[in-house]
Amino acid sequence: MMTKEELHKQLKELGLKKRMKILVHVSLSKIGYVDNGPDSLISVMKEIISDDGIIVMPAYNSYGEYKPNLSIVNEIFKNQCDTIRTNHVIASFAVWGNEKEKIGVNIEYTEEGLSFEAGERSPLAKLYDNNGWSLMIGTDYSTCTILHLAENRANWP
C-alpha cells in the first residue's frame, strides 16, 4: 500500500513542483493500492502544484452517472467544487487552479462551426501555450490527449 506521504515524495521526485500546469492521465489500478485512493492522489497533486498552478484532466462525455470504464480519479476530480468543466460535447476537460478560466475555455460556435476539441482555441492549446506539462500515471502515450493537438498543428490527416 502506498501512503499519501510516499505518493507525495514520488511525485516530487518525478519533477512535479509548485505552479506547474499539468494535463493528467491516470490509471490508479496500474500503480497499486493507494491509501485513500483517488482522493489522496488528487490532494497530493494540489498540494504540490498549489493553486498557483493548474491541473487539467479529461472529463470525458459522461454527464450522468459514473461509468466504470472511465477513470475514477477523473470522475472525482471533475466533481469537486473548486474545479470547472469545459462544455465541449464530446471532449470536455476538468480544470483546477487560480487561473482555471485561462485554460478552461468553453467551446465556441463560429462561422466555421463547432471548435475542434484539440484546436487552437481548445484547453489543450491553452495549456501548451502556457508551458503545460503532461503527467502520465500508470498509462502510456496511447491515452495522451495532448497528442491530438500535435496532430492538429502538424496538419496530420
Where are these regions (language model features)?
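N-terminal and secondary-structure boundary signal
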Residues: M1-P157
